[in-house]
Amino acid sequence: MRETKVQREQLADVGDYLKAFACTAVMGQTVLSLGLTTAAGQAQRVPIAWLYAAIKFTAPAFICGILFSTMRTTIPRPSLTQYYRQQWHALGVPTLWWTLAYLLILPSVQQHQPARTVEQFLWQMVNGNAAPHLWYNTMMLQIILLMPVWWVLRQWATTIGRRKFLLESTTITYALGMWAYTYWIYDTARYGRWYLTDRIFLGFVPYAVLGIVLYLVWPRVRQWRWLAVPCLVFGGVAVGWQVHQLLQVQPLSLVRSSYYLPANVLYALSAIGLIVSLAIWQLRRQSRWLPVIHWLATYAYRAYLANVFWLTLIWSAFGRQLASRHVGWGLLLCYVLTWVWSFTATYLLHLTWQKLKTIILNWRNRKCHERNQSS
């Protein structure tokens, strides 16, 4: 049965689960990175490495979720003008404002070289160096701009043979890319200089393709009951593999973890599978969590943009002191407060902006009405 437009906009889907879990997990990555800046955190580097590896799936999951939800909610396909205008307001405007907030209010969180000239300032806005997490925006917006390509793939991959070819060709190409990255970049001095490779959309194309194919075969996938079992096995192996790689370098540096490494790719796919299996189970039961997941997914991107801003304030106010004394409780409290306030502030800002728009619109309508009456 085809979904109505209202149903497509209101029902939680697998994409919502992927986006909500990715946003929730990614906030922990920055918290753990800050924890390692303390002596107490370095003393607990092994559990921190395990925790970090367990939540290192967020960017692939978010891309997969975006593509799944977009494929589901863009039937019939909207005009490019309509789609890009909608994405500009939903993604572009929040990205612009939060990037400016980081550069102007918290310039200390800039990555690599801080901006000292106008040209460098503009470059920091574009390349994702304005804050530790904004590299993802640079990559994700490329995926969004390429949506016409993904629509063409959806229209083309309508048979089993074509979907099989799409998955196999993507897998082989990406495997060769991983080998080249590991051999020519990761294990060399180029790794630090070539950090912009993480911001190129090509490295995340497989997850976009996965989201498209997952949408196309969803009626069959939603019948699977044991998807979580192999995902748990492969995910456990991949986490251990990542931790082994991280702990080879002392002191522990989480920057050494790259989404382009085989262990990280295996874990990202396993984590996506686990989240999909949870979504299947809850969708089948019509869980009461569906509206909650949909709400979280709606505000996930904007909360993600804001999280480092609030975490920096929390860390400066009392987080560092608490984590230096009780690293576990300190990092947990910083994470919970960051998560709660990121979503709360995002929602309050949304309500405020909606109220302001209503006031402005009413004022304009009243002025137009008065002008028409006077004429």
Regions found by a protein language model. Name each.
Residues I48-A59, M125-M139, W184-Y207, V243-G273:
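Interfacial loop-to-helix transition and helix-capping segments at the boundaries
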Residues P219-Y299, F309:
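Alpha-helical transmembrane segments and terminal signal-anchor/GPI-anchor hydrophobic tails
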Residues L34-A40, S108, H112, A180-Y191, ...:
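Juxtamembrane "helix-exit" motif on the non-cytosolic side of transmembrane helices
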Residues Y102-Q111, A115-Y186, D198-G203, A208:
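Hydrophobic alpha-helical segments with transmembrane-like composition
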